[in-house]
Every structure is written in C-alpha cells, then in structure tokens.
C-alpha cells in the first residue's frame, strides 16, 4: 500500500459549514463563526475572493472561481463576472489572496471524541504514527526497543518522584508485548498507566495498581467485565475497563489536564480546518458541560460541537428499557443549545470491539487464534435497537467486524420487518471489514455508512501480516462498493483513533 499524500493544494476559507449557492444571484450561508476571512462584519462591505478553483459541494453549481462574502453570509459564487452581476450596484472589493489556490468549504469531522482527544494528546504520546500537534510533534515509535526507550525517557523527565506517567499510543503489533512486569521494569515506584492505541485497553504497573487501591478479589464476579482483564499482566480491555475507570479518571482526568487538553484540541482542529464535529456516544454530566462550555462554547472557538447520547452506558448501569429512554430524553433536554449541543432523536449503539485492538468479531476468526469481543451483546443490542427504533430515533451503530456487521444487519432487517420506517438512515459506523453481499444488504435496508478510511492507511499493511491476512486486510473499508450502490457515505477520524485531518482522509480511500 502506498503512503497517502495530498492530491491538491487547498486553503480552507473561513469556517462556513455549508455552501448555498446560485450562479447569478444571492444566497445565504450558514452562520460563520470565524472571522478570519470576513471583512468587518455588519458594515455592509462585500469582499469578493478569487481562486483557481472553488469546490462548492453544491451539485447544481459544483465549481466556481469567485465567492462574495459579507459579514457572516456568503452572497454568491460563480465566475468573477457572474458574481459581479449578482452583486449589481453594491460596492465590493476584490481580494486575490487565494488566486492560485483551491478553496473548500469548512471541513466537518463527522465523528470524533473531544474527551478522549483531550486526554490522549495531553499524555506522553508514543504511538504507531507521528502526531503533529500545535507546538509539538510526537514522532512514531516503530518497534519494541524504541517504545520502551521512549517510555523510560518520559519517566526520567518527570520531576516529582510520585508523579504519574500517562502514555497513549501503544500497540502490540508495533511495540511488542506489554504487561505489568515490563512496566515495573521502567519504574517500580512511579505509577504508570499506558492507554492502548485504540483507547479500549489500559495497562498498569504495580505502583499504579497499589495507588488506586485495586485488589484481585475485587475484580472477580463482575460479569462480562471480569472476563476482560488479566490481573497478573495488569491489563484491562473493553468492558473490563468498567472495573478501573472511575478511580483512574480521578487522577488522570483532572480539571487541569482536561482544560489543557481541550484547549490543545481546539487549536489542533482549527489548524486542520475542522469547522464542526459530532461525538456519537457522548457521556456528558453537568460537570462535563461546565468544562466544555467555557472552551468549546467560547466565541473564540472556531467550530461547532454536536453530541449524540450513548446507549451502551445505560446497559452497563443496569437501566431498564423505559428508564433508558427517559434518561436519553432528559440528557438532551438538560443540555445547552447553540455551538455546543446534543442532537435530539439520535442514539449511539455498539456491536463488536475495536479494530485497532483487533477485537472486532470476524466470521473466519484471526490467523493467530485469538477472538473478538462484544461491546454490547447481540441480545442487548437487539433490545436497545428495538427500543429506540420504535421511538423514532436514528440509530448510529458502531461495528467493525464482518460477523458484527451480520448481527447489525440482521437486527436492522427485523426492525424493518416488524415496524417499517421510511428514510430511517441507520448509520453503519466505522465499517472496517465487510463483504460485497453485506454492502448490498446495507443498500436494500436503507442504511447509510460513516466509514473511517484511516484504517486502510494506518493499519491494513500490518493486519495483512498479523491477524487478518492480506485478503481481508486489503479490502477494509469498502468505500467504492458503497458508492457503487448509491449508499450515502461520509468519512470520519474517530479522533484519537485517527488524526482529525480531513484533507488526508480525502486521499486515504483512493490509495491502495
């Protein structure tokens, strides 16, 4: 697989999330919350920006070479002559700053996680790829020796002997086996917590386990969670994380760390041209809103933040069906409105485990004999899907493996048979592995696809060698198959699963 690269030289104009254009008239744009390219809002001054090409994303007028902007509104787009004609006798100034550039509307990351993005990227990042952040770049660690060396350097750099060392980005296939013993060799006294690259696993050394007050006995008898941990190795994954996260977050997700991480994430998204994002599966309490609003809701933050309620946590918390629906409606009702808000009548459900951990459910298993996991059992997923389907919700269903996709499509088929809904737009989220028959079923059932194309760039080559084999790894994220069947398709980063860099994601699916 070739390395991805930029195909065009692009400048993102402003932070307008959509274009509403005509060829010889005026049109309004959605509210612009970044004034970088807008001249003196509310003064009546019109600026006409010229460009080599403007990709409008409007089917009736896909290309332009000039766009007229006044304050928060896009007035017209087309050729320079067409724009002048549309403006009539209104005064305007022509700005040729982008004359040799290609312009895009503001970019939307359809699926990312601000809480995870803030936490992961505020740790010592030692990952499988470079992470270019505002003011700092974390280079990739390419093998086990390099990984452990970087971890030891991070330990040595900490001043306080009792300070925690938090790191994110570890992956078995790049960095070799990691366990409690290996972390104890880095430090037997400093608490160390390593967050696996997928964010679905944690490794703790003995000092961290003692600092958090965990005991082996307390880890037993907790249902599925107790089957997804290894005490001796200091390893917790998927549902097993429920056993450790509350105490761990008290020392990890401190207000100081979260404020730093969120502000860094705002700068990171802005430098990559993101103008809006959604987090499907948000766990937001009143305290989280208090943290988010001053930062994400600030007038100075140049993008919108939208959220969809998480249904998996309702199962984990033991809520019944009626209680779950009421809890969802309450969470949306209590949320603020404006730049930071919940989207009503939408819900996030989960099928199988993370692809980055190779814990998705595969019909033909894995080449090394390990097995995948369910984030929600098929039975729970079916019940919750039926609950929210019957209540008129749009379903967003996380699924990565082809076996997981079979389960999701079977559930969707039952919903359509029992309670048909037109234009339900159920979202197949991530869409890592599939076959052509499954893509055809997606089309027949009226679902849509939100895919993560970074899987093919970041992981396919390694998975061809380990776990999946080349036949399945080389066919991950079948975007072309989706488009051939006229299924609506969007891309997302799932930050921090992939970098939130939409221009790179434009390139990723076309390279094999």
Feature map (PLM): residue ranges:
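His/Asp/Glu-enriched, well-ordered alpha-helical/loop segment
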Residues: 260, 386-396, 400-426, 430-431, ...
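Acidic (Asp/Glu)-rich catalytic clusters
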Residues: 296-298, 332-338, 421, 442-444
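Divalent metal-binding segments
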Residues: 29-51, 55, 59-326, 345, ...
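Ligand-binding beta-strand-loop-alpha-helix segment within the catalytic cores
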Residues: 448
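N-terminal Sec-pathway targeting helices
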Residues: 1-11
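Conserved alpha/beta core surface patches that mediate binding of polyanionic ligands
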Residues: 330, 338, 342-345
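Alpha-helix termini
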Residues: 157-159, 334-335, 415-420
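Bacterial N-terminal signal peptides
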Residues: 10-23
């Amino acid at each position: 697989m070739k390395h991805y690269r930029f195909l065009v030289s692009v400048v993102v104009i402003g932070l307008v999330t959509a274009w509403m254009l005509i060829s010889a008239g005026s049109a309004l744009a959605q509210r612009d919350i970044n004034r970088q390219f807008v001249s003196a809002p509310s003064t009546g001054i019109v600026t006409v920006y010229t460009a080599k090409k403007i990709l409008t994303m409007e089917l009736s007028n896909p290309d332009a070479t000039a766009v007229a902007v006044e304050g928060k509104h896009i007035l017209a787009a087309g050729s320079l002559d067409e724009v002048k004609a549309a403006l009539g006798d209104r005064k305007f100034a022509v700005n040729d700053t982008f004359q040799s550039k290609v312009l895009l509307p503001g970019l939307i990351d359809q699926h990312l996680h601000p809480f995870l993005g803030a936490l992961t990227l505020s740790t010592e990042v030692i990952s499988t790829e470079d992470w270019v952040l505002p003011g700092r770049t974390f280079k990739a660690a390419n093998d086990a020796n390099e990984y452990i060396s970087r971890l030891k350097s991070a330990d040595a750099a900490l001043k306080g002997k009792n300070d925690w060392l938090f790191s994110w980005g570890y992956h078995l296939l790049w960095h070799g086996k990691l366990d409690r013993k290996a972390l104890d060799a880095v430090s037997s006294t400093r608490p160390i917590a390593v967050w696996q690259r997928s964010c679905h696993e944690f490794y703790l050394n003995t000092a961290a386990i003692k600092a958090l007050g965990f005991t082996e006995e307390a880890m037993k008898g907790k249902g599925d969670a107790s089957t997804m941990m290894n005490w001796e190795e200091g390893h917790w994954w998927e549902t097993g994380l429920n056993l450790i996260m509350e105490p761990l977050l008290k020392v990890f997700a401190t207000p100081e760390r979260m404020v730093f991480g969120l502000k860094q994430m705002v700068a990171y998204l802005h430098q990559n041209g993101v103008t809006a994002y959604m987090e499907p599966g948000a766990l937001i309490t009143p305290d989280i809103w208090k943290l988010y609003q001053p930062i994400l809701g600030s007038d100075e933050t140049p993008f919108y933040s939208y959220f969809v309620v998480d249904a998996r946590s309702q199962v984990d918390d033991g809520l019944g069906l009626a209680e779950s629906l009421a809890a969802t409606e309450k969470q949306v009702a209590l949320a603020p409105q404006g730049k930071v808000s919940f989207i009503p009548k939408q819900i996030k459900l989960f099928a199988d485990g993370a692809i980055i951990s190779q814990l998705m459910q595969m019909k033909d298993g894995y080449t090394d004999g390990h097995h995948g996991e369910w984030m929600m059992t098929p039975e729970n997923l079916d019940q919750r899907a039926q609950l929210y389907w019957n209540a008129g919700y749009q379903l967003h269903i996380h699924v990565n493996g082809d076996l997981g996709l079979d389960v999701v499509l079977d559930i969707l088929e039952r919903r359509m048979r029992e309670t048909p809904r037109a234009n339900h737009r159920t979202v197949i989220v991530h869409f890592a592995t599939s076959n052509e028959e499954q893509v055809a079923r997606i089309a027949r059932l009226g679902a849509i696809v939100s895919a993560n194309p970074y899987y093919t760039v970041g992981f396919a080559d390694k998975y061809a060698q380990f776990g999946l084999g080349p036949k399945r790894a080389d066919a991950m994220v079948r975007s072309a198959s989706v488009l051939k069947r006229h299924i609506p398709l969007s891309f997302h980063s799932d930050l921090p699963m992939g970098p939130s860099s939409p221009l790179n994601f434009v390139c990723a699916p076309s390279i094999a």
